[in-house]
Swiss-Prot record:
Residues 375-389 have a biased composition (Low complexity). Keywords: DNA-binding, Homeobox, Nucleus, Phosphoprotein, Sensory transduction, Transcription, Vision. This is Iroquois-class homeodomain protein IRX-5. Pfam families: Homeobox_KN. It comes from Mus musculus. Residues 318-328 have a biased composition (Pro residues). Disruption phenotype: Disruption causes increased KCND2 potassium-channel expression in endocardial myocardium leading to abolition of the cardiac repolarization gradient, a selective increase of the major cardiac repolarization current, I(to,f), and increased susceptibility to arrhythmias. It is found in: Nucleus. Signal peptide: none annotated. The keyword DNA-binding applies. The keyword Protease does not apply. The lineage of its organism: Eukaryota, Metazoa, Chordata, Craniata, Vertebrata. Residues 203-212, 249-265 have a biased composition (Basic and acidic residues). Belongs to the TALE/IRO homeobox family. The gene is Irx5.
Amino acid sequence: MSYPQGYLYQPSASLALYSCPAYSTSVISGPRTDELGRSSSGSAFSPYAGSTAFTAPSPGYNSHLQYGADPAAAAAAAFSYVGSPYDHTPGMAGSLGYHPYAAPLGSYPYGDPAYRKNATRDATATLKAWLNEHRKNPYPTKGEKIMLAIITKMTLTQVSTWFANARRRLKKENKMTWTPRNRSEDEEEEENIDLEKNDEDEPQKPEDKGDLEGPESGGAEQKATAGCERLQGPLSPAGKETEGSLSDSDFKESSSEGRHDELPRPPRAGESSPAGPATARLAEDAGPHYPASVPAPGPHPSAGELPPGSGGSSVIHSPPPPPPPPPAVLAKPKLWSLAEIATSSDKVKDGGGGSEGSPCPPCPGPMGGQTLGGSRASPAPAPARSPSAQCPFPGGTVLSRPLYYTAPFYPGYTNYGSFGHLHGHPGPGPSPTAGPGSHFNGLNQTVLNRADVLAKDPKMLRSQSQLDLCKDSPYELKKGMSDI
């Protein structure tokens, strides 16, 4: 039977003496009455045995202890049989069973290896051997950790922590031979220390940044093909594009590199929009997905679309030189058919309202793209007619662009009855410097309001599947066109 240190149980040989009548006047039995047993034993009322009982007067037992005039002599006589709790006489040694290192304070016995704080050399040798065999993938699975914990007599937490520290050490020494990942496959739950999370997240961040910069630095071709993938794939947590399609800097880079290199265009998107960030956002939405500079970018991988014509970006930017003829514009997109457009024209009113507020239709068919360019072109300083807007679909079965500005279209989709001279302005190219005139004032105001709606809409609409985004807005726009 073991007792914690400092709580002294008298040996059985001595207890026989203390079982005398309680109020005898003898010195031996005096301090051992029931009310004094704990007081002189050194546990609760006095830190050391006899320190209070024999030196301080107390009404309970003072009359039974007849001391001489010298209390020190009496105390010495008393200690001759009581002894200190740390002074184990031969008689006491046999009956005191507590462990000298306070084993009762822990749930493990003293010699248990699970109680050990430090890993032994054998344990670390085993772990190092496993690590050397798995340098390509130093992430033990849960089963391997349990096996190693049994072999090394360590806990599962200790094994996980050891591997986290080992990976960090190797990384600091530039001996990393594996590709870092966020967590190991078996999801080390709370057992793992935070060091491992920080350890593996940091190398991930530069790689993510590199991935995000890849499409921008690659010029307009990659931008054209990556436009729909960005929105259809899972949203990357680090990317700024997910907030409002593409960030300002993103769009400026792509417009400066891709468009200005191959087809010289005077201004950038951010600089050419006088109405500020709202119209810049409109420019971003339509711009990156219709790069006019690419004569024939490959079809979009995700939607199977044909390359958009050069109308969308040229409407938003200041007047361009005459564009190359749009290639292969007669092929029909695969996501919807003309039959669907013809049969489901009852949604036109809903589609018209939602089409302008929808955030960045990523990969619309050519028709939807031109419509978007038309409806969003108004905030730009140049009037929205450009040579590329003249007839994006020569000989196509769907309506060509100039018809969108006639009276039946705009009263239904915006709140304007007329657009001033825009109706009668079918010329191939307006003057480059024509700023927004008086007929643009109401238009600017309303489009800016719609831009505010745009800024809020992406957050709501992104919760839906990204494929719907790629489908719906151009789909409804084209349905609207079939009604005219």
